């Protein structure tokens, strides 16, 4: 049973890094069609933002895989599995949009994945309440990060905006579920460290 689970998660990790993601929901589409073409500068900026979002989803896969494998209770395992499934949609959506923008994922994805996997294992070994609290805080920070992207994306890039808006809805749901399941609030130093690490990742992934 444990071996089967490890093989399954290894397969998911490979798919995350190779871009072969399974999409359970279609790519969100804007309510109204895009009016006008993006300028080269707007296209480049949108691609940078969507690359950052794609990296975030690579990290989410690693985090939730590690937290699922280290979770003590069946209910916590199920929660991390459900979140990972929805985040895999996000991974596929952002990869799809990057292709539409004639861009590419981050060249450092293996590094981001490995780091997030280690962090997920560390959080999981501290117990389910801490691990769920880490999930809740992660989702809160991602929600804030997506709000920032919605304010930065060109108004005419309705395709990217539709994806980010649905991602935000899902992240809010994941964070609330983790809190409702008993996740504790992390101490301030831990939250600040998470924000600092996130800034390094987002600034680097925008270009690389």
Swiss-Prot record:
<dbReference type="InterPro" id="IPR009078">
    <property type="entry name" value="Ferritin-like_SF"/>
</dbReference>
<feature type="binding site">
    <location>
        <position position="171"/>
    </location>
    <ligand>
        <name>Fe cation 1</name>
    </ligand>
</feature>
<comment type="pathway">
    <text>Cofactor biosynthesis; ubiquinone biosynthesis.</text>
</comment>
<keyword id="KW-0479">Metal-binding</keyword>
<feature type="binding site">
    <location>
        <position position="171"/>
    </location>
    <ligand>
        <name>Fe cation 2</name>
    </ligand>
</feature>
<dbReference type="GO" id="GO:0046872">
    <property type="term" value="F:metal ion binding"/>
</dbReference>
<dbReference type="InterPro" id="IPR047809">
    <property type="entry name" value="COQ7_proteobact"/>
</dbReference>
<feature type="binding site">
    <location>
        <position position="57"/>
    </location>
    <ligand>
        <name>Fe cation 1</name>
    </ligand>
</feature>
<dbReference type="GO" id="GO:0008682">
    <property type="term" value="F:3-demethoxyubiquinol 3-hydroxylase activity"/>
</dbReference>
<feature type="binding site">
    <location>
        <position position="174"/>
    </location>
    <ligand>
        <name>Fe cation 2</name>
    </ligand>
</feature>
<keyword id="KW-0472">Membrane</keyword>
<keyword id="KW-0831">Ubiquinone biosynthesis</keyword>
<keyword id="KW-1003">Cell membrane</keyword>
<comment type="function">
    <text>Catalyzes the hydroxylation of 2-nonaprenyl-3-methyl-6-methoxy-1,4-benzoquinol during ubiquinone biosynthesis.</text>
</comment>
<dbReference type="GO" id="GO:0006744">
    <property type="term" value="P:ubiquinone biosynthetic process"/>
</dbReference>
<feature type="binding site">
    <location>
        <position position="87"/>
    </location>
    <ligand>
        <name>Fe cation 1</name>
    </ligand>
</feature>
<keyword id="KW-0408">Iron</keyword>
<comment type="similarity">
    <text>Belongs to the COQ7 family.</text>
</comment>
<feature type="binding site">
    <location>
        <position position="139"/>
    </location>
    <ligand>
        <name>Fe cation 2</name>
    </ligand>
</feature>
<dbReference type="Pfam" id="PF03232">
    <property type="entry name" value="COQ7"/>
</dbReference>
<dbReference type="GO" id="GO:0005886">
    <property type="term" value="C:plasma membrane"/>
</dbReference>
<feature type="binding site">
    <location>
        <position position="87"/>
    </location>
    <ligand>
        <name>Fe cation 2</name>
    </ligand>
</feature>
<dbReference type="InterPro" id="IPR012347">
    <property type="entry name" value="Ferritin-like"/>
</dbReference>
<dbReference type="InterPro" id="IPR011566">
    <property type="entry name" value="Ubq_synth_Coq7"/>
</dbReference>
<keyword id="KW-0503">Monooxygenase</keyword>
<feature type="binding site">
    <location>
        <position position="90"/>
    </location>
    <ligand>
        <name>Fe cation 1</name>
    </ligand>
</feature>
<keyword id="KW-0560">Oxidoreductase</keyword>
<protein>
    <recommendedName>
        <fullName>3-demethoxyubiquinol 3-hydroxylase</fullName>
        <ecNumber>1.14.99.60</ecNumber>
    </recommendedName>
</protein>
């Amino acid at each position: 049973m444990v071996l089967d689970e490890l093989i399954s998660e290894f397969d998911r990790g490979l798919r995350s890094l190779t871009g072969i993601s399974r999409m359970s929901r279609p790519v969100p589409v804007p309510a109204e069609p895009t009016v006008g073409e993006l300028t080269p500068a707007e296209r480049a900026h949108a691609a940078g933002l969507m690359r950052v979002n794609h990296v975030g989803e690579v990290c989410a896969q690693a985090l939730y895989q590690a937290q699922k494998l280290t979770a003590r209770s069946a209910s916590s395992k199920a929660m991390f599995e459900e979140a990972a499934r929805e985040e895999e949609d996000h991974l596929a959506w952002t990869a799809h949009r990057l292709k539409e923008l004639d861009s590419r994922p981050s060249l450092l994805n293996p590094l981001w994945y490995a780091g997030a996997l280690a962090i997920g294992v560390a959080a999981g070994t501290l117990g389910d309440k801490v691990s769920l609290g880490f999930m809740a805080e992660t989702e809160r920070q991602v929600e804030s990060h997506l709000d920032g992207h919605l304010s930065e994306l060109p108004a005419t890039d309705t395709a990217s905006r539709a994806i980010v808006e649905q991602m935000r809805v899902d992240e809010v749901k994941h964070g609330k579920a983790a809190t409702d399941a008993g996740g504790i609030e992390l101490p301030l130093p831990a939250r600040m460290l998470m924000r600092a690490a996130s800034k390094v990742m987002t600034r680097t992934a925008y270009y690389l």
